[in-house]
Swiss-Prot record:
HAMAP family per record: FtsY
Gene Ontology annotations of biological process type: protein targeting; SRP-dependent cotranslational protein targeting to membrane
Statement: the UniProt record of this protein carries the keyword Cell membrane: yes
UniProt: GTP binding residues: 308-315, 391-395, 455-458
Subcellular location: Cell inner membrane; Cytoplasm
The protein's name: Signal recognition particle receptor FtsY
Gene3D superfamilies: P-loop containing nucleotide triphosphate hydrolases, Signal recognition particle SRP54, nucleotide-binding domain
């Protein structure tokens, strides 16, 4: 099982902890050109298997590697992905559908928490089915719920169509770029999965709007030697348009200017140096932390609070995180504590069904969010799960109310689960740019934030806001979203982000 939370990043890293797949008996017709290139005796099935399971001998470890090495690495990775696909034959569609439906029904039944104290706790009898809830209440609420349900259905249909699988994968330009990024991080071709290739493809495409406006203009400027005043002003304008922010822009220009005074760099080398600057900005908030890794602790309960303004994608992020946690081998529960926004609880339940994760909710109106969190902790403890995800209200009308609510939730957690590892993540809409950053400053004051989840990168030309978050708020980017699908949220890698931003 591939653990997305503990996936290792960074240039020249060793292979990840997850063990490489066992050697597969690969049919020559899967990738004949690779077999002929890498085996001296193609007729020997065992020798083919051994060579495919082991890393190719010429795996590149840096951007200076020979392009032919990357090509061989990509071919080997492609062949291994296809070999694993051949090993695991998919069940018939009807059986798969039955399994999924059964899982969803079982999940719906699990939205039950037995009361453990005087706190009000939701029981199965109290929780009407989604159909019942949508048909009760005022007409305006019914209409709102129906719209939310239709919206979620539309997103789900779009999700399936946009996901790349081993069957639909081709060795196209996206695959070659993704393979090069993975190889440059020291990854083994035997360890690469179709899911990783698919994610890097989406990240590259998601940052294309920012990249088109950024790279070509920068190359034409930085390749002309030391920066004069006109060049500085032009670079400043380019970076600010990408919402890099004033502080980060000043730092980038100063550092780049100092370097170009020392030596004249051709455009490609200047861009490589610019990549180093950007990575240093993104990684700086991690320097003061004990570990750069952000993953649920294997032992004990982890409580992750998700905060952010309405419309930033907070509830959607909850569902995607739950799905990723389950895929990575963690047991997870969601607490629907956003009781302020209409239909928020219903939206969380839809995402819970999709991800196959139980949702703890209170069907009453104007429920105390802290009571829902209490019930969520009780459910997590009784089921011995690793991770509790808490959806909180996205309010900025009154900072005092926000601070009071978050403080009350933290008190409940400290009392009910004193040994839990508590993290607070801010969900930020990348399309808002600097406006979103100002909202983030309010949440940073109200909550002890552990990091930021940057969403909607696929619809924005303002991907530079990630640099502004790191520079101005000194907050690490923990996860990024580049699509509407349930698999389109992944842990953040400064190396992969910068490569997609400047070298895509």
């Amino acid at each position: 099982m591939f653990n997305w939370f503990r996936r290792q990043f960074g240039k020249d890293n060793t292979a990840p902890e997850s063990a490489p797949p066992e050697g597969a008996e690969v049919s020559p017709e899967l990738a004949p050109e690779v077999i002929q290139a890498e085996t001296e005796s193609p007729s020997e099935e065992d020798s083919q298997t051994t060579e495919l399971a082991a890393p190719p001998p010429e795996e590149p470890s840096s951007d200076t590697a020979n392009p032919d090495d990357y090509l061989q690495w990509a071919k080997a990775a492609y062949q291994n992905i296809q070999a694993r696909k051949a090993e695991t034959v998919s069940p018939p569609e009807s059986a798969a559908a039955i399994t999924v439906e059964a899982g969803i029904e079982e999940t719906a039944e699990e939205i039950v928490v037995a009361p453990e104290s005087d706190q009000a706790t939701a029981t199965e009898a109290d929780l009407p089915s989604p159909e019942t809830e949508i048909t009760t209440g005022p007409a305006w609420l019914q209409k709102s719920d129906r719209l939310e349900a239709l919206k979620e259905t539309a997103v789900e249909e779009a999700t399936v169509a946009g996901t790349l699988t081993a069957e639909s994968m081709a060795m196209d330009d996206d695959f070659m770029w993704s393979a090069k990024v993975l190889a440059a991080q020291g990854r083994s071709a035997a360890d690469v999965s179709a899911e990783e290739i698919d994610w890097l493809r989406k990240l590259r495409q998601g940052l294309s709007k920012t990249r088109v406006n950024l790279v070509n203009q920068l190359k034409s400027i930085v390749g002309q030697g030391p920066l004069n005043e006109a060049a500085v002003e032009e670079i400043e304008a380019i970076l600010l348009q990408a919402d890099v922010g004033v502080e980060a822009t000043d730092y980038i220009i100063t550092t780049l200017q100092d370097k170009l005074r020392e030596e004249a760099l051709p455009p490609e080398q200047a861009i490589e140096f610019l990549k180093e600057i950007l990575r240093s900005i993104l990684d700086r908030p991690l320097l003061s932390l004990p570990s750069a890794e952000f993953a649920p602790e294997a032992e004990g309960l982890n409580v992750w609070l998700l905060t952010g303004v309405n419309g930033a994608g907070k509830t959607t992020t909850i569902g995607k995180l739950a799905f990723m946690a389950k895929q990575s081998g963690y047991d997870c529960v969601i607490a629907a504590a956003d009781t302020f926004r209409a239909a928020a609880v219903e939206q969380v339940k839809v995402w819970g069904e999709r991800s196959g994760v139980p949702v703890i909710a209170n069907p009453g109106q104007n429920t105390d969010p802290a009571a829902v969190v209490y019930d969520g902790i009780s459910a997590a403890q009784s089921r011995n799960v690793n991770l509790l995800l808490v959806d909180t209200a996205g309010r900025l009308q009154n900072k005092k109310n926000l601070m009071d609510e978050l403080a009350k939730i933290r008190r409940i957690i400290d009392k009910k689960a004193p040994n839990a590892t508590v993290e607070s993540l801010l969900v930020l809409d990348a399309t808002l740019g600097q406006n979103g950053l100002r909202q983030a400053e309010v949440f940073a004051e109200a909550a002890k934030l552990s990091g930021v989840v940057l969403t909607k990168l696929d619809g924005s030309a303002k991907g530079g806001v990630a640099l502004a978050v790191a520079q101005q708020l000194n907050l690490p980017i923990r996860f990024i979203g580049a699509g509407e699908g349930i698999e389109d949220l992944r842990p953040f890698s400064s190396y992969e982000f910068v490569e997609a931003l400047l070298n895509g």
